[in-house]
């Protein structure tokens, strides 16, 4: 009986374990099917974004390549991505899931939510097409533990997908000391976070995934991935993305209402309703309405305002953001136990930083001053803030100098309120040699005068030619002499014989030991004697014939060489900087031809400076490249280069093609500049 009971128990356990295994397998199969369906629904709408970024550093505009991910959210080709991916772009290229690469235009950049809206641009004359798109889902329906898929292009590789779960659908970042909201700050200083409760998840996020969709198992976009690392990922909810998208569709921009107070939760006040006023911004609608720190706001425009916990603060700001700009709203509040109602006129919320631009001829960059900047940085509300000064240019050489952080208030005779005023003032003063500028530095208002001219290009040095042998040598030091088998050897060992020279024609060879000049022994044996032979040659007459005593393979012999004029150095060559594309070139010299082993009749201009962040550097142009042609126009000299480039600047072709000689091989360099930014 015991054996029978034991056998039955074992059979029951076996059946139970088998049922559990089958149940797990069924769940895994169902999950796999859901993942595949979600993937198939959204993957066709995934885009890989390549951007040419424009940023400002060192007093000039610079350019770099970047990238990220995005998702098509409408059949007419609207794309959602991150602001920090696309905001600085002057060129945007989107690669679709079928491999087609299209240029895109930015419709709106929204720093407050870290979202940008782009539109795909079909090729010219191409028929209209309906793009595959992914639907926006309901981020408010997400719960902790829900499965989500992070899609994107990590490390700019092809499309990928990772699986995770929602860890917290309402994540905010708090200051641990006072429980106030912390903003995310981007490289250029823009801030995001006051309006956002992020979706925290653990699907793997890598660089390049930014801007890609967070997808539920229905195949709906419930978020736009923003950042991640160490097993943590954060996405902007689709609720916010939908609001941004709809505003851009409707009006072409995103505008938000603003009252000008900092909201805090009421939990510490032992109350569940209202929102605590932590600070009131000077000259804001809230201050004008008489609102004070410590007030508890109960209703705005008749709608309850409740933020008991920090996670509810973004909802308060979102409610205010939806108020019509210019509308006068009633605000019910409580102060010291008494209830009162005040009136405030809603103003437009401003971005933290204003627009920035380069003023190339004067060598500086500047940005508009916004009210938020003025409040936090003690700047005037009107004027432009200098963000960089280029060494050697007019602002840098003025006394006193204008430096980064100064605010320009007046340029010439014109008052400066913004960048447009500054552009007009510079244009009006372009024929004026000396221009007075009034600027503010901290609490001082200073005046300076600049000379209205860029730095002069270096003049070619007027070198007089000297007698030249046409070889390079090293001193026969004692260790070298011993290695050569005769410790008593003194003089010079030939290390290079320049081509096309009299020395080459006379038969001098690398490895020859020069022991005497015109019968006079050479006594060089120390490294400091390295120029002795060169100096003795330079004191002789050009065209004179000298007799060298050399040792070759143990045999002494005499070789006669006619001295020739020393070739012009690089400093003596004509040079020019191409200001629009920001690189410098010079004529090539005979010495260049010799050292690079170019043909004796080789022509072209030699690239001498390609600054970091320039269009040339972005395209792969290098110092030492020899430019042979520009847009199929042959280049022989600096004069040819200047004439061809003047025509290029006038025509502004989408691609400037440089045909170059690099490391003894020819190659092409394709520059694709943003002419609008360059020539404004």
Q: What does each model-identified segment do?
A:
Residues 1-4:
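Positively charged n-region of N-terminal signal peptides that target proteins for export
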Residues 416, 422-423, 608-656, 663:
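C-terminal soluble interaction/assembly domains
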Residues 6-16:
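Bacterial N-terminal signal peptides
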Residues 665, 669:
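C-terminal interaction modules of eukaryotic adaptor/scaffold proteins
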Residues 294, 405, 511, 624:
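Conserved catalytic motifs of ABC-family nucleotide-binding domains
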Residues 21-293, 299-328, 334-339, 345-372, ...:
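Serine-dependent protease modules
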Residues 377-389, 589, 594-610:
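Surface-exposed beta-strand/loop segments enriched in Pro/Gly
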């Amino acid at each position: 009986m015991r054996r029978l009971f034991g056998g039955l128990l074992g059979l029951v356990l076996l059946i139970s374990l088998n049922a559990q295994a089958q149940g797990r397998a069924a769940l895994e199969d169902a999950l796999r099917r859901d993942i595949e369906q979600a993937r198939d629904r959204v993957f066709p709408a995934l885009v890989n974004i390549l951007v040419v970024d424009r940023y400002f550093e060192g007093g000039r505009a610079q350019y770099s390549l970047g990238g990220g991910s995005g998702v098509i959210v409408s059949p007419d080709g609207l794309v959602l991505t991150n602001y920090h991916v696309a905001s600085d772009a002057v060129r945007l290229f989107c690669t679709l899931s079928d491999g087609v690469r299209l240029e895109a235009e930015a419709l709106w950049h929204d720093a407050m939510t870290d979202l940008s809206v782009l539109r795909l641009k079909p090729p010219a004359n191409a028929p209209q097409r309906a793009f595959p798109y992914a639907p926006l889902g309901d981020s408010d329906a997400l719960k902790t533990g829900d499965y989500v898929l992070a899609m994107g292009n990590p490390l700019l590789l092809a499309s990928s997908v990772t699986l995770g779960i929602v860890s917290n659908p309402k994540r905010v970042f708090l200051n641990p000391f006072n429980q106030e909201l912390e903003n995310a700050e981007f490289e250029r200083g823009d801030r995001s976070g006051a309006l956002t409760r992020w979706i925290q998840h653990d699907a793997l996020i890598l660089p390049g995934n930014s801007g890609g969709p967070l997808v539920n198992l229905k195949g709906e976009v419930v978020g736009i991935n923003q950042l991640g690392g160490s097993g943590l990922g954060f996405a902007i909810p689709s609720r916010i993305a939908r609001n941004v998208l709809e505003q851009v569709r409707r009006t072409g921009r995103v505008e938000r209402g603003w009252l000008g107070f900092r909201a805090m939760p009421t939990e510490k006040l032992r109350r569940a309703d209202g929102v605590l006023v932590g600070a009131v911004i000077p000259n804001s609608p809230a201050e004008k309405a008489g609102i004070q720190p410590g007030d508890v706001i109960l209703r705005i425009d008749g709608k309850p305002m409740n933020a008991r916990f920090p996670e509810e603060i973004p909802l308060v700001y979102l409610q205010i953001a939806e108020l019509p700009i210019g509308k006068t709203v009633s605000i019910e509040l409580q102060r010291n136990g008494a209830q009162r109602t005040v009136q405030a006129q809603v103003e437009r919320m401003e971005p933290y930083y204003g627009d920035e631009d380069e003023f190339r001829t004067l060598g500086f960059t500047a940005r508009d001053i916004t009210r938020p900047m003025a409040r936090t940085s003690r700047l005037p509300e009107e004027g432009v803030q200098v963000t960089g000064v280029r060494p050697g240019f007019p602002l840098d050489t003025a006394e006193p100098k204008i430096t980064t952080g100064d605010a320009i208030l007046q340029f010439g005779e014109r008052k400066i309120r913004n960048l447009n005023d500054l552009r007009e003032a510079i244009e009006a003063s372009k024929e004026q040699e000396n221009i007075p500028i009034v600027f503010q530095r901290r609490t001082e208002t200073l005046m300076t005068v600049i000379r209205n001219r860029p730095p002069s290009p270096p003049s070619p040095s007027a070198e007089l030619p000297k007698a030249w042998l046409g070889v390079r040598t090293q001193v026969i030091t004692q260790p070298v002499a011993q290695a050569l088998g005769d410790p008593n050897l003194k003089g010079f060992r030939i290390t290079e014989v320049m081509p096309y020279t009299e020395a080459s024609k006379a038969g001098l060879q690398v490895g020859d030991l020069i022991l005497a000049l015109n019968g006079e022994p050479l006594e060089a044996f120390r490294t400091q004697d390295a120029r002795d032979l060169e100096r003795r040659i330079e004191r002789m007459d050009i065209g004179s014939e000298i007799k060298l005593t050399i040792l070759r393979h143990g045999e002494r012999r005499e070789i006669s060489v006619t001295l020739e004029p020393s070739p012009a150095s690089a400093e003596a060559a004509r040079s020019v900087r191409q200001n629009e594309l920001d690189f410098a070139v010079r004529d090539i010299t005979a010495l260049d031809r010799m050292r690079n082993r170019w043909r004796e009749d080789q022509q072209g201009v030699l690239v001498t400076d390609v600054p970091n962040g320039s269009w040339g550097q972005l395209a792969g142009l290098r110092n030492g490249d020899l430019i042979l042609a520009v847009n199929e126009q042959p280049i022989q000299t600096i004069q040819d280069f200047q004439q061809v480039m003047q025509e290029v600047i006038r025509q502004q072709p989408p691609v400037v093609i440089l045909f170059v000689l690099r490391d003894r091989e020819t190659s092409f360099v394709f520059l694709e500049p943003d002419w609008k930014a360059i020539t404004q």
